[in-house]
């Protein structure tokens, strides 16, 4: 078994008087849904050394000691004048506290919401601070006259980008990143990491695509050679393409036919983490999300989002046995604005009790709203199973909205083309996959051999399938080929609706493949596969995988085949 590389800090000059310090974790760092591809990550920090020294975005608590060690090897930290913060959270606060102990002379530079957060997490109302609202500059000398661009969104209301005209580097914090760890500092061969960037966008940016478009408009005013991102490779070679992609992905969200208003507040970040996973489930099903942090939103913004939405989901922590005041205010707006034919959902985290979720749920039930998923209550921090449940709940919510719209739309006969496409037949199979504590499965008939050497195949996976999360490049799965004559039982089992995070393999005879995925013991044959790449194909992903192992379990059996008459459904 290969050993995991230890966490470290990679240091490299990236421009005139400018250095990156990349704190690297080679394994999955956190349980948030954005890290689910499990390719590790980097927390990128930057040092600009003009006549004065500025440090940008020190990493979170995981890297505190190794980061400060690396920093002290390269300079006297008492010479640092400024620490510029793209956003502030409790995780980053641990590093800031440790830095202040050895460099108490520091002045912090942040947005106005960031200043409020910073004073709170550091428990110091008298911190020396420069607040940047978008018009101020900070002259470090030697041409490094920094400019600041507030780019707030519901998840990061304090988001602040920094631009250095001397190097034409734009420090983008959460924008344009990816959770990948490697030796490559820049994005040479950028097309190979597009999948990771798209996943990062879908998890972090899609729920507030409107604010992303506003940020892109602001950033377009600055001639830029390099995006100095908060995570993953720095963007130099594919900068134009990635900027265009962010535009396209955001426009897909803002022009969607159906929208869900996701309204929440978060005390310690746990409810926000749940909101992010639910939003990911909704958007992957082709429904847009308007994310609103009601701690920072004005009543009219909440009212407008609810009015235009097809449904709404509310999330709240429980503080002192109650929902926070901003949540109670938002609930009042929802009850007075949303007609009760809109679909509703409720979620929240708590420490000792969960009265906030109960309160919201009871108020909505009394008002006659239907629920798109059972209310979600999570004690303390969510884990990967909890986040899978949240993502699948979001997908169920979106599918219910789409189904309701479809029912209202008059069905039309299949066209000649659709009837012709329906004559394409495919083997009946079940895709099974397991990653950590998460497992999933789906019935599949859009399967084809794709290569002889290496032996490879393609599978079309609908974007809103739960198993889609486990079919990214590098993932492993098993393709179970069903046997004619005994396939109906397995077919019916895997066609039935499953609840969020429900065990797909209950009452099914399985064994474990070498790659860790379940093998159906009643299958005709099975193939152990490794995903090499995938292509976006309309409402599906076309997944290409190579076959690493396999076995025929019944030499006399015949493959079950799925016959259709229309190509507009399965």
UniProtKB/Swiss-Prot annotation:
The keyword Oxidoreductase applies. Mediates electron transfer from NADH to oxygen, reducing it to water. This modular protein has 3 redox cofactors, in other organisms the same activity requires 2 or 3 proteins. Keywords: Electron transport, Oxidoreductase, Transport. It holds the Pfam family Flavodoxin_1. Residues 260-402 form the Flavodoxin-like domain. CDD domains: flavodiiron_proteins_MBL-fold. Gene3D superfamilies: 3.40.50.360, Electron Transport, Fmn-binding Protein, Chain A, Ribonuclease Z/Hydroxyacylglutathione hydrolase-like. In the N-terminal section; belongs to the zinc metallo-hydrolase group 3 family. It comes from Nostoc sp. (strain PCC 7120 / SAG 25.82 / UTEX 2576). It comes from the Bacteria. PANTHER family: DIFLAVIN FLAVOPROTEIN A 2-RELATED, DIFLAVIN FLAVOPROTEIN A 4-RELATED. The keyword Electron transport applies. This is Putative diflavin flavoprotein A 6. Residues 38-231 are annotated as: Zinc metallo-hydrolase. Its cofactor is Fe cation. Residues 421-570 are annotated as: Flavodoxin-reductase-like. One of its GO terms (molecular function) is electron transfer activity. InterPro entries: Flavin_Rdtase-like_dom, Flavodoxin/NO_synth, Flavodoxin_CS, Flavoprotein-like_sf, Metallo-B-lactamas, NADH_oxidoreductase_modular, ODP_dom, RibonucZ/Hydroxyglut_hydro. Binds 2 iron ions per subunit. Its EC number is 1.-.-.-. It is an enzyme of class 1 (oxidoreductase). By homology with NorV in E.coli, may be involved in nitric oxide detoxification. SUPFAM superfamilies: Flavoproteins, FMN-binding split barrel, Metallo-hydrolase/oxidoreductase.
